[in-house]
Amino acid sequence: MKIATLSIGDELIFGEVVDTNAAHISERLYSVGFKVQRQLTVGDNEQDIVEAIEMLAVKCDVVVVTGGLGPTVDDITARSAAKITGHELVLNEEALARLQRFSEKLGGNLHPSNEKQALMPANATLIPNPVGTACGFYLTHNGRFLFFLPGVPGEMACMLDETVIPFIVSRVKRRTFLQTKVFKVFGPSEAEVDALMDGVADEAAGVSVAFCVNFPEIQVKLRVEGHEEAVVAELLTRAGDKARQRLNGYVFAEDGETIDTVVASLFRETGFTLSLAESCTGGLVAKRITDIPGSSAYFLEGIVTYSNTAKTQLLDVPQRLLDEKGAVSSEVAVAMALGARKLSGSDIALAVTGIAGPDGGTAEKPVGTVYMALAGSNGCQAKRYTFHGDREEIRLITSFMAMDWLRKRLLSLRSAEVTD
């Protein structure tokens, strides 16, 4: 079954609002075995709406339309649907009754303009809206199923799950099962990842590979589809094992995990504690740590020492080092990490200092130069990196690299404990 989505609204065309509805519909349909073939967006123009629906209905069996069912003058989707089918707009008594009950529930009377939301083509079937005023409807046109839902994301999602998806599923005689596995990779380029994954896809068996760059990570997505759920699951497991082997060392998370949740899990598992000393990242690493609920169990302290004075007063960084080596140096990064660990009493301390730009770079230390240091019971190690991008990108990849270093250190410490 071929499915298309049509999103309606000038606010979408003008870039004032991001269209999350199309993405949600595609994701939900994919989860039950259907792939959206086409997505289209048009503004609040009757001719554009009519032409878009007619075009999509030629290519697809189902068209899910969102937006334009409100009470204002620019809400013209129902009128456009009536024009397509050649039926008049009529007042749907059930929709009107629902509107009245909803208004009374909110302690008011139904505004006359809201009655417009009860108008729909005479051949339409009502789709109830349990959480809002805009009822949807569906109808058939030249053998195609056309669904019309409100543009409010929460209302649309509820009606999609309660009416649209069950309807579509009931019309399919032989279901297709779709399963996905995601590997999140950090380090190699997209071209390098593509080369590593060569041979994993198997078109004949229904196994495909896709790549998505979500700076600074690369997501490798395995997709398997077939008519036997057990076979699909087995194929995905095999492909996943092969991909994991090919990407060995570069995978930091899988599926719904993130670098932040993985690091959090490792801290909880190992029982180690952490402190941070940040300069160029301005607390961004600490934010990533504390974004995860329960981080207070292992995160003791985070200090942003942006100025040299703060570095000396709060972290006991020797003024001599700052004068001789500069604030952006491996020596100062080490001193910051050791100072943070001493101050907090943590098992591990990580420090970051660098030049995020756009100014401040030199020939020896250009913009993007970052030093990190990681201190623990066995001493302190420092690393130098040279990142590229604008200020925001440099700060982002620096924080990501810091989290990845913590991940690798915790994995190493966990492995050492197991060996002991």
Swiss-Prot record:
Pfam families recorded: CinA, CinA_KH, MoCF_biosynth
Gene3D superfamilies to which the protein is assigned, alphabetical: 3.30.70.2860, CinA-like (3.90.950.20), MoaB/Mog-like domain (3.40.980.10)
CDD domains assigned to the protein according to its UniProt record, in alphabetical order: cinA
Superkingdom field: Bacteria
Family per similarity comment: Belongs to the CinA family.
NCBIfam families: cinA_nterm, PncC_domain, PRK00549.1
Protein name per the record: CinA-like protein
Phylogenetic placement of the source organism: Bacteria, Pseudomonadati, Thermodesulfobacteriota, Desulfuromonadia, Geobacterales
